[in-house]
């Protein structure tokens, strides 16, 4: 029997001042999670503690009337909601509400294949929900609780105790998995295998380049976060044998809960010998620069500041030939100020294979410790 797609209407609540590409990204994230955006509301934050003005909240409640009673419907606030603001919105609209962190975690759940990825996602979700549950307990004592994260489930107090216990258990299990990963890395290093971590903004073509380099056919697509669990492959090229690792993509303003929960995944970059940073150069210059800046800042946040870094300027098949040199200089200028260990910018196309041989040659030269480059 064929599956029937569930109708998941949503209202997207966006802060004013986002760049056009960030607005597009918000729509893409909502759609990737399976939501159909039926309306949008723009707002300006009232204060640090209050997201929506009373007038904006009334406007949102009016827009949401058609969604009331639909268990699949969501109000998606493209910001990080504080507990009091979360319940304020739910009470006014009567519609289940998620914020940006919850949305990203829903997408992660769709692509999580490994036990570790599922645990990391659950840990991030529980940590994010914990303050909401504390606020729910406070409101329940005041008899002002409008409903919390959908119908059914545990009584609030019992659920809070369960969450605390579950977080502790997941952290223990992830520590054990992290220990095993470290043992595996040590074995590969003992065998003399350098590690190349492929990183970059979501949907830049990291997995496509990983496939082009390794000859594998891992799933790729235009949607965000197709890679949640790192993929590893040892290959030989230019007289060397190395391990390439495809990692989870970066995104603007990565929530701290996600960085912390995915520490062992992001650690692949921190322990690599070379960072291969993939950039989509088919986008406008300002978008390229902003995404590169965000990604490099994320690397710094996880302690990657002195690893040799090569930028793969990807998707040159979508760029006029005469623009490639200019884009290369743009990336060199933007990256070198933030990341002094930048080694090179190599134009490539993961789709056609153009430039991949030169990229591998440059990596081999770097690993061999050769000064300069003959590539």
Swiss-Prot record:
One of its GO terms (molecular function) is GTPase activity. Signal peptide: none annotated. InterPro entries: G_HFLX_dom, GTP-bd, GTP-bd_M, GTPase_HflX, GTPase_HflX_N, GTPase_HflX_N_sf, P-loop_NTPase. The keyword GTP-binding applies. One of its GO terms (cellular component) is cytoplasm. Belongs to the TRAFAC class OBG-HflX-like GTPase superfamily. HflX GTPase family. GTPase that associates with the 50S ribosomal subunit and may have a role during protein synthesis or ribosome biogenesis. The gene is hflX. The lineage of its organism: Archaea, Thermoproteota, Thermoprotei, Desulfurococcales, Pyrodictiaceae. Residues 194-371 form the Hflx-type G domain. Its main location: cytoplasm. Disulfide bonds: none annotated. It is found in: Cytoplasm. This is GTPase HflX. Monomer. Associates with the 50S ribosomal subunit. Mg(2+) binds at residues 207, 227. Its cofactor is Mg(2+). Keywords: Cytoplasm, GTP-binding, Magnesium, Metal-binding, Nucleotide-binding.
